Amino acid sequence: MKKKIKIIGAGPTGLITALNIVNKSDFEVELFDAQETVGGLAASVNIDGMICDWGPHIFHSAHRDITDFWLKNFGDLLVKKDFFYKNYKDGIYYDYPISWESINKFPKNIKKKVEKEINNLKPENLMRARNFKECVVELVGPTLQKIFFEKYTEKLWGLSPEKMSPNWAPKRIELRKKHKAFWSGQFSACGKYGAGAIMDRMAKTIQEKGGKIHTKHRLKKINIIKNKISDLHFENGKNYKSDDSIVVSTIPLNNLCKTMKLPCDLMFNSVRLMYMVFSKNRIFPKNTHSIYFAHSSFDFHRASEQKQYSDTTFPKGKSIIVFEISYTQRKHLGTMSDKELSKRILKQFCSLGFVKKEDFLSAQSVKMPNVNPVMKIGYEKELSKINSKISKVDNLHLAGGSAEFIYGDIQTMVARGNDMADLLISNHYAINKNLKRSLQFKFNENVEIYGHKIGLNHPTMVIAEIGINHRGNLEAAKKLVLEAKKSGCEIAKIQTYKGKDRVSNTSKEAKYADKTLGMEETT
C-alpha cells in the first residue's frame, strides 16, 4: 500500500514538501488550502493587469543547492538583480541596513556619540540581554537603537521592544562601510510575473505527477483517536479520513491549535496591504525598491514600488506602491474601509513629496492576520507546552515558519520543505530520532559516555551546558569548566566554531538562518 501524505496549507513550505515527495517517491500526496489560489503569503494579485506580490518577495540564498533549485525550475520566471532599501527618519533617507555612509550624515555631535558607543561595545554583554531592546543596544549602542530600531519595532509588532524576547533580536548587525545591495554577496531575484507565478508552477508540477490540490478548503476541526488523526473536517463541509495518512501542517500554529481545541496564547502580527495605483511612470528614485517608516505619523511601516522589482506587467505611465500596515495593536487600521484608509494613506504619502493627490488612480487592500510570530518575553514556555501536546499525535508533523512559530523567508521555507520531504520518504522514518514514531521501539537501557555508565541502576549524570564559543574568550570558557566541576557535574559540554559561521554552510541549520537580517542563529 502506498504511503499517504496530507499537507495542510499550500504556501511555499507545503508546495516544496509536496513537490519533493512526488519527485522522489510514489506516495499519494494531497494539499489543502483555505484560499482560492496556492502560494500562501507568497501569492500575487492582479490589479488591472499589473502583477503585485502580497508584499515583495525575494528569492535569495547563499546556498548553491537552493539557488540551483530556483534557476533550474523557475529561471524563466525570475529577474535576477540587486535590491536597495532606505530608512526614512526626520526627512532624511538613510541606508538600510545601516552603513557608515549613513552615520556620516548625522550631525557631528550625534556622529561622535555613535562612534564612541560602538567603540565601547563589549560582545560578552550580549549574552546578558534580557529583551529585544537590550540585545540591540549591545550590538549597535543606545543611540542607533533609538534612532532605527525602537519605534519601528513597536510599530511593526505592536509590542514594546522591552517586552519582546531577546530570541527575536538580531544576533549580529553588520555596519557596512558603504551602501550595498541588501543581499550583497548572495544570489537574489524576484518574480518576473510575481512570486505567485512560481507558486503556480510548483502546483502544476505536483498535479502533473499525481498529487492533488484542494483549494477553498479551510481546516475547521481535527478528530484524534488514540493519539492519531482520524479525520480532517473543513469549513466547506468536506471530510477526509486520515488514520491511514501522515498529516503535515504548515498553517499558523494558533489556527492549528484551534482545530484541535488546544488552548493557545501565541500571537502573530497582522498586516494589511494597501495597493495604490498612481499615474506616474516611476515614483521612488531609481534603485530604491522599498522604504521603511518608523514615525507614528505614518500608518504604514514599509512602502514598496512593485514596478522597480519587476516592470514586466506594468505599462508606461503607471506604477503601484504597496503599503504594509501592521494592525496587530492598531485595530482600527484593520477595520477601516478601503476608501477611508486609502484616503489617510494618500494624504500621508503626498506629504513626502513622491506623488501629488491628482496622481492617484485607485486603491484596494488585502488583510493577512497571521504573518510572523510575535515573540513576547516568555513565549518559549507556551510554545513548549503546545509542542508537547502536539508531539503526542503520532501522524502529525509541523513544517514551516508559521507552523513552527519561527521567523522564515522563502529560502528557509525551501530548506524546511526539502528536509520534511526527505524525512517522510526515508526508509528509517519509523525510528528516525527527529520524527514521531508510528511503530514502537526500545531505546538502549544503558549507554557509556567517557567512562561513565548511564541508565538503569547507575547514578544520575549531570552535564553542564556552558555555552558556545564564548565570543572567542578562552579564559571565560576555562572558568566555566572549573565552575562546572566545582558544582559536581561529571561533564562540561562546550561547542566551538571557526570563522564567521556557526556551522557548515551546507548543514541543514545553516539554511534555516537568514544571515542578512541576523534574526536566527545557527547551531
Please report, for each region that a protein language model flagged, where it lies by residue.
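N-terminal Rossmann-like FAD-binding beta1-loop-alpha1 element of flavoenzymes
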Residues: 3-31
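Glycine-rich FAD pyrophosphate-binding loop
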Residues: 22-46
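Mid-domain catalytic core of redox enzymes
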Residues: 24, 218-339, 343-353, 386, ...
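Dinucleotide-binding Rossmann-like beta1-alpha1 core, especially the glycine-rich loop
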Residues: 48-124
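N-terminal amphipathic alpha-helix/helix-capping segment at the start of soluble metabolic enzymes
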Residues: 441-463
